[in-house]
Amino acid sequence: MSLNKNYLDVPGTTIFDADESRKGYHLNQFCMSLMKHDNRERFKSDQRAYIDEWPMTEAQKQAVLDVDLNRAISLGGNIYFLAKLGATHGKSFQQMAGSMTGMTEMEYRDMMIGGGRSVEGNRVVGENGTAQAHHQPQGQPQGASNKRAK
């Protein structure tokens, strides 16, 4: 029995539900491994060899190598786990979040200090707000392939 996931209509947002958790399990476990110094050093010395030890999909591995956080999230990555990948590369969470929105770190900071994105035009997929896919670097609605039928 499938759940009716009304939240797939929230633009620019991936809800980390049970399905996403299952899809990204190995990706997220890889990220958790980076909490250990020895694992971070092994990863930094030969990224491909280290990620090949993990049973991730090739798309997940490529997202890690590209440090493409939007892609990693679309493949089941959880931002709190992915933060360990960013930290391994010397990035702050603010830098990571900015990169996910197509903004510089300072543009992102200023937006957040100003109260974040407006909800106007961003309540459901298909409006014309700044969180809509056509305004984002990833260019596709989150969950586009899973979007519920109206």
Located regions from the model:
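Charged, low-complexity intrinsically disordered segments
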Residues: 1-150
